[in-house]
Amino acid sequence: MKRFECSAIVFDLDGVLVDSTEYVEQQWRRWAVSKGLPIEPFLRVCHGRRALETIRLAAPHLNAEAEVAAFVPEDEAGGQALRPVEGAPRLLETLPVGSWAVATSGTRAVATDRLRRAGLPIPGVLVCAEDVLRGKPSPDVYLLAAAGLGVVPTECLVVEDAPAGIEAARAAGMGVVAVTTTHRPEELGADAWTTSLAGVHVGRIAQNARQGRMLELLVLDL
């Protein structure tokens, strides 16, 4: 078990709160087939990245800006319910209001739709692809989330599942817990890892005039 202290927690969305990995990969398969492109380069880099950066990396010969304007994610589920990652509903219920945010590489429309379909609350601070000029692995989404929560970046803990997101959190000066839904622990280089949010628990919640709110987070290597 590892113990962390932080003022706020910032979650990635896909693969961390919502079990949407299958839909993300299906979208890229459909798009690659429609362009006559091999899918493997896209699957290697799509997790944790915006569509813009994914296309730039996997198909550098294309005009990524023009392509992403026509890239409209559509889940194969057709609006049906999505599963939350195990432990996500319980963990979010135990966190104080205003102590957590979501920072995702998806658009706001996709993010809010997936949260609703998974039965999860939409946080007061939700940072999405269109909110930043640079997507992950640049730290912009996490820095913006910290600002929205009113805490300094070094007092935030990030929960991620993808190398690009972990690199972004590191660049923002934040600690990182990895959920191994899309990558193996050795691929991630996080401060701690767990197979699902069932392994993450809120311990003590303290409040004082000097530091403000302080959360204790316990992470079990499940």
Regions found by a protein language model. Give the residues of each.
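Asp-based, Mg2+/Mn2+-dependent phosphohydrolase catalytic module
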Residues: 1-6, 99, 108-222
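N-terminal helical cap/lid subdomain that shapes the substrate entry/recognition surface
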Residues: 2-96, 107-109, 120
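Short glycine- and Lys/Arg-enriched binding-loop motifs that mark or flank ligand-binding interfaces
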Residues: 11, 44, 102, 131, ...
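Hydrophobic residues in well-ordered beta-strands that form the structural core
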Residues: 19, 102-104, 178
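Short linear interaction motif-like sites in intrinsically disordered regions of transcription factors
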Residues: 29-32, 101, 194
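Residue-level marker of regulatory loop/turn positions in helix-turn-helix DNA-binding domains and
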Residues: 84, 103, 134
